[in-house]
Amino acid sequence: MSSSFSSSCFDVEVTEKVAHIRLNRPDDLNSMVREFWTELPEIVRGLDAQGDVRAIVVSSTGRHFCAGMDLGVFTSGDTAITPGDSHEMGRVRARLRQTALMLQESFTAFERVRMPVLVAIQGGCIGGAVDM
């Protein structure tokens, strides 16, 4: 039996008890945008909860595996650091810490699953992609 679904950053397919998670933003070198960091742990935890998946393989589409983090993660949304924040450095640092913890939690999802996770890398693997 086979099942599949897609998100803004990933295509996921489960075939013969193997889940294949593909980074699918080749035009942007599969860079890790804000959605990447929320979608990845949700996908991994969901596969773990299914109970029938025995292994996860992570790969990508395009010439390169991943160009690393899109630095826009630090300049948009709740974690944005703006020039007006300079007088409140404590708050800036607290937001930065929360962002770093959220980013780390995304990769920690791989450690918490009950099955092995393999990563197939082709082309460039830069920055945060090396940590994955």
Regions found by a protein language model. Name each.
Residues N30, G72, G127:
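Nucleotide phosphate-binding site architecture
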